[in-house]
Every structure is written in C-alpha cells, then in structure tokens.
C-alpha cells in the first residue's frame, strides 16, 4: 500500500512539474547593402546562405537594408544591436567605418563583415576571399585559349599585387609566350576595355568589384562585327553577376565564384556554437576573421565555354598551384 502511495505521489509530481522548454533560438541579424535582396550580387548570395543555413540550424533572422549613407548604415546596425542579435552580419565594405565605431562601443556584440578586411576589432570577423588564387586561374585559363597571344586584366588602381602575383603568374605558368597586360582604371571601364581589345587582347579578366555594364557592351559590340577577332571574358561572381545577360553569357569563358553562401553558413554555425572566426588576417593591423580560398571550396572556378572545357585537366592541375597562394 505504501508503495502505491509513493507511486501515486510521484505521478502527481510528474503532472505538476513543468517540463523544461528548449532554449529559444538565437537571433542572427543581417544588414544588407544598398538595394537589399534581388540585386543578384552580394545581397542575394548572403541571403542564399541564410536560407541554406536555416535548413539545418535553428535561428531567427532580423534583416535590414541600408540606403547607403553613413547615417543610415549606423541606424540599421544600431537597430539590430537593440534586438539583442547574437551575431550581426554586415554585407559589404560600405559598413566598415560604421563597424569600426560600433564594435568598440559594443564589445560584447559579435559582428561579421562580408568581403572586407578593414575593421580592426577582436569582435569583428572579416570574411574575405583569396582573390589572388582566382586571378591565377583566370590568367592560366585565359592563356590556354588565347589566339592572339595577348590577354588582359582590367583592374582597380589598388590591385597591382593581384595582377603580378595572380593573373600574370597564371598566364606565365600556362604559356610563357602569351603576354599578360593590365589596364588600371580610375575612370571609364568601357574605355579600358576598348583599349585592351585594340591592343590585341582576346581574353579579358574583369577583376573590379561592382561591375560596369559598359565593359560587356564593348565586348559584345566587338564580337558582332564582321571579321573581328572574338574576345572572351572571365568575370567574378557575385561581384559582377548583375551585368551578365543572356546576350553576354555566350562570350563568357569562365567565372571566378566567391562562395559567399558557404561563408554565411559557416559564420552562423560558429555563432550558434558560441564561437567566431579569429584567424589572423593581418596581425600587425589587428584584423581577424577568415580568408576563403580554393581549399575547402570557398573559391570555385566555373568553366563556361566549350573551348575551355577541353582544358579542364590542365586547369585542375593549375588549381593545385593556385591554392598555395596565401593572399
């Protein structure tokens, strides 16, 4: 009888004692750059990563979009901080100056910034991509299919090392007789494209972030001319995806792909487990985060043209050399 009473009492306790609820999912904040979703560039690539992460990880999302002004960027980031986000992801280098200030004001908040390494703060993970590796493969591939013996890279004025250590090195490793040239641009990208085509380049690597549709127009205009030497293009995604159309796609030889979606998944997974990326990107400058490269699939090289597809084995060998480049 005593045993029955004890059991009955235990059953009553079981009914009355509340079952501990699972912990509420963390909140991930994301600050999209100008235009937000639908830009077919870094915003969309980041959103794709969020969606993929949501299939296997438990978290909520708070999203904001900036109009691009410094005041608005700060306003958007502060709104995410106020919502107690476990991690705030800023898409694009435009948020750099804002995070440089707010990271010190809110040292317990974890931030990440995509495609930028300018914020020196231990609570900011800079997520960047080994662009030199991609440039090496672009140069190697351009030389493989060049018929004029001259290939070109259109670059920003601060990309001299990218040309020397990446594109030019890839060209020389591919075919020593092919001449790599570079056109640094501070003004018109279309003029730069016209000039390198006039100089004899028949494959162009466009390394600039934020594409200029005029470059594509110049290439198309050249290629539709009778008896013209056809020009191929190697571009970067998601940097230049916005300007790629059904008309220009047929002139794409290859694409260097920055796997922003993969980086977003990794960042969120780290945050949920209570960690962050703290690899040394530049110890002297105090920059931390992660550099994604060919190893691990952070940078991919997508062959577009049939002509280049026949060079696939050689490009795979070149990729093994490219992934040893640290920058």
Task: List the model feature ranges, each with a label.
Residues 7-13:
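Hydrophobic helical h-region of N-terminal Sec-dependent signal peptides
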Residues 1-7:
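Bacterial N-terminal signal peptides that target proteins for export
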């Amino acid at each position: 009888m005593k045993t029955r009473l004890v059991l009955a009492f235990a059953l009553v306790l079981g009914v009355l004692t509340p079952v501990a609820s699972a912990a509420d999912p963390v909140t991930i904040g994301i600050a999209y750059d100008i235009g937000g979703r639908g830009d077919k560039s870094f915003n969309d690539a980041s959103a794709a990563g969020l969606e993929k992460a949501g299939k296997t990880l438990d978290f909520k999302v708070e999203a904001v979009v900036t109009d691009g002004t410094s005041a608005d960027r700060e306003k958007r980031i502060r709104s995410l901080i106020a919502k107690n986000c476990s991690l705030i992801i800023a898409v694009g280098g435009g948020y750099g100056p804002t995070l440089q200030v707010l990271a010190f004001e809110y040292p317990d908040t974890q931030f990440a910034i995509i495609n930028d390494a300018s914020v020196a703060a231990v609570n900011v993970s800079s997520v960047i991509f080994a662009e030199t590796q991609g440039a090496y493969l672009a140069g190697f591939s351009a030389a493989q299919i060049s018929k004029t013996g001259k290939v070109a890279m259109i670059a920003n004025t601060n990309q001299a090392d990218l040309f020397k250590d990446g594109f030019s090195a890839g060209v020389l490793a591919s075919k020593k007789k092919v001449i790599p040239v570079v056109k640094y641009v501070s003004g018109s990208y279309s003029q730069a494209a016209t000039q390198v085509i006039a100089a004899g380049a028949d494959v162009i690597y466009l390394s600039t972030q934020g594409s200029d549709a005029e470059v594509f127009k110049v290439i198309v205009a050249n290629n539709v001319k009778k008896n013209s030497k056809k020009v191929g293009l190697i571009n970067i995604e998601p940097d230049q995806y916005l300007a790629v159309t059904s008309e220009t796609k047929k002139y794409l030889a290859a694409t260097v792909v920055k796997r922003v979606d993969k980086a977003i998944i990794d960042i969120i997974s780290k945050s949920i487990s209570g960690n962050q990326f703290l690899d040394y990107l530049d110890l002297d400058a105090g920059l931390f985060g992660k550099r994604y490269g060919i190893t691990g699939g952070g940078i991919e090289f997508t062959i577009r043209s049939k002509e280049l597809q026949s060079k696939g084995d050689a490009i795979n060998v070149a990729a093994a050399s490219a992934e040893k480049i640290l920058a």
